[in-house]
């Protein structure tokens, strides 16, 4: 994806620092205070232009959401949605998710969403995939005991790699669909990419995986 430089982006992000949290490492352990309530917190790693998080937050006001996106020129589009109509249970972070464990305290997050992540198809780039074991360990660190990952992609190779990576890590796969849009799954909220790919006839793959609270026998 080619990103268009937006010279105004940082100024806008700084102006709305109550939405895009500028120094998230200073907020670790205090996110419920930032939201002003005790509601559960769900995060999306690689939130892109924010449609999924925006729609999820609107549909579920009893849950707090945080979208994490490293590209400034992309996250500013997500911010623009919230400037037009602020959603109090949604915040954004403009940082790389590799630093996830410094943004949140242990057990502070209830669920992680990974939607249409970069597949990094070359073997030498395996460690960059957001379902590589190092990332799975980081998610586990910030999730509550028994926390979940919900993952969607149109890339069959990444999907197969991801379910294998999760299983090898010891996670429990609680839901799996090889063709989400032709399944009986209810309540699916689409991302921008999902709408684009599915309209072209691409299959959408989905898996929900849960961290085990007890070691496998």
From Swiss-Prot:
Signal as UniProt keyword: no
Reaction catalysis annotation: guanosine(46) in tRNA + S-adenosyl-L-methionine = N(7)-methylguanosine(46) in tRNA + S-adenosyl-L-homocysteine
Species of the source: Bacillus mycoides (strain KBAB4) (Bacillus weihenstephanensis)
Pathway the protein takes part in: tRNA modification; N(7)-methylguanine-tRNA biosynthesis
Stored SUPFAM superfamilies: S-adenosyl-L-methionine-dependent methyltransferases
Binding positions (substrate): 122, 154, 191-194
Active-site feature positions: 118
Name the UniProt record assigns to this protein: tRNA (guanine-N(7)-)-methyltransferase
UniProt keyword S-adenosyl-L-methionine, yes or no: yes
Gene this chain is encoded by: trmB
């Amino acid at each position: 994806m080619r990103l268009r430089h937006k010279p105004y982006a940082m100024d806008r992000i700084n102006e709305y620092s109550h939405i895009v949290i500028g120094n998230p490492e200073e907020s670790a352990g205090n996110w419920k205070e930032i939201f002003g309530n005790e509601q559960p917190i769900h995060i999306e790693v690689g939130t892109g232009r924010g449609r999924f998080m925006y729609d999820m937050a609107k549909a579920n006001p009893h849950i707090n959401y945080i979208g994490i996106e490293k590209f400034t020129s992309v996250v500013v589009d997500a911010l623009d949605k919230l400037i037009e109509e602020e959603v109090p249970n949604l915040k954004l972070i403009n940082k790389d998710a590799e630093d996830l464990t410094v943004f949140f305290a242990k057990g502070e997050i209830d669920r992680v969403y990974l939607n249409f992540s970069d597949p990094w198809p070359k073997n030498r780039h395996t460690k960059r995939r957001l379902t590589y074991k190092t990332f799975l360990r980081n998610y586990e660190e910030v999730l509550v005991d028994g926390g979940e990952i919900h993952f969607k992609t149109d890339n069959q190779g990444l999907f197969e790699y991801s379910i294998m990576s999760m299983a090898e890590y010891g996670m429990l796969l609680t839901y799996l669909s090889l063709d989400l849009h032709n399944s009986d799954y209810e309540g699916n909220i689409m991302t921008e990419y999902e709408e684009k790919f599915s309209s072209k006839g691409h299959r959408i793959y989905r898996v929900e995986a849960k961290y085990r609270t007890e070691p496998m026998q």
